[in-house]
A protein has these predicted regions:
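Short alpha-helix
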Residues: 143-159
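Conserved beta-strand signature within the Rossmann-like core of class I S-adenosyl-L-methionine
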Residues: 111-119
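Conserved alpha-helix/loop element of class I SAM-dependent methyltransferases that forms part
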Residues: 1-18, 28-32
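A short acidic, Gly/Pro-enriched loop at the edge of an enzyme's catalytic core
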Residues: 70-85
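Class I SAM-dependent methyltransferase SAM/SAH-binding core
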Residues: 20-74
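A short SAM/SAH-binding and catalytic strip from SAM-dependent methyltransferases
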Residues: 83-96
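A short glycine-rich, Lys/Arg-flanked "PGG" loop and its adjoining helix->strand segment in the class I
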Residues: 98-110
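Core SAM-dependent methyltransferase catalytic element
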Residues: 165-190
Length: 190
C-alpha cells in the first residue's frame, strides 16, 4: 500500500547513530535511512527467507547493515548499545509484543529513541468490531498480522513515553489503515 511507504519515508530518516531495526524483513526501509547520520543498522528478524532477500538488498550500503536471525522477544546483544530502534509494521506480527518492547527498552541507550510506524486498532467502535471479527482469519492468511492491536497502549505498557505520536487513517480499508507513528523514549524509572 502506498500509504505505508509514505510513513516509512517520514519516520525512517529520523534514525541516527547505531540503529536496531526490529523485523527488518526483506529490507524495505533501507532506501529511507540517512547514512550521513546512521553509523550502522543491525536488523533482527526470525524469517530466514526474508533476511536472505535483505542481505542481497543491503550490498549497496558498504557493510553498514548486518543481520541477526532471532525473534524480537529475546535478542542476544548487550544492553544499552543502540542510539535508536526502528519498528515498522512489525508489532502486529510479533507473538509477544510486550516482551519485544522490553527488549527494545533494554537495548536502547538511556536517551535513545524508538521510531515506529504501525497499523492497528481503529478508534471507532464500529471498525473495531470488524477488526476483532476478522482478526483470527486475517492472522492465518497474513503472516501472523493482528489487525486489532492497540499500538499506543502496547508502547506505553512496554515502558515508553511518547515524544511524538500521530494517529490517523491512510488510504485503504479502515480495518487495515489506521496508523500509529512517531517517536517514543524510555519512561523514567520510579
Amino acid at each position: 500500500m502506498e500509504g505505508f511507504q509514505k510513513k516509512r519515508a517520514q519516520i525512517v530518516p529520523l534514525a541516527y547513530g547505531r540503529v536496531l531495526e526490529i523485523g527488518i524483513g526483506s529490507g524495505l526501509n533501507f532506501d529511507f535511512y540517512n547514512f550521513d547520520i546512521v553509523d550502522e543498522v543491525v536488523g533482527v528478524d526470525p524469517a530466514v527467507s526474508s533476511v536472505a532477500i535483505a542481505e542481497s538488498r543491503s550490498s549497496k550500503y558498504d557493510s553498514k547493515i548486518s543481520f541477526i536471525e532471532e525473534t524480537a522477544e529475546s535478542i542476544a546483544l548487550d544492553s544499552e548499545t543502540f542510539d535508536c530502534v526502528v519498528i515498522g509494521y512489525t508489532l502486529c506480527t510479533i507473538p509477544e509484543p510486550l516482551l519485544a518492547l522490553a527488549e527494545v527498552n533494554r537495548l536502547l541507550k538511556p536517551h535513545g529513541s524508538l521510531f515506529f510506524m504501525e497499523h492497528g486498532l481503529a478508534p471507532e467502535e464500529s471498525v473495531q468490531k470488524w477488526q476483532h471479527r476478522l482478526a483470527p482469519g486475517w492472522k492465518k492468511i497474513a503472516g501472523g498480522c493482528n489487525l486489532n492491536r492497540n499500538i499506543e497502549e502496547l508502547i506505553l505498557t512496554g515502558g515508553f513515553e511518547f515524544k511524538d505520536l500521530k494517529k490517523k487513517y491512510i488510504k485503504g480499508p479502515k480495518i487495515l489503515s489506521f496508523q500509529y507513528y512517531g517517536e517514543a523514549v524510555k519512561a523514567p524509572q520510579h
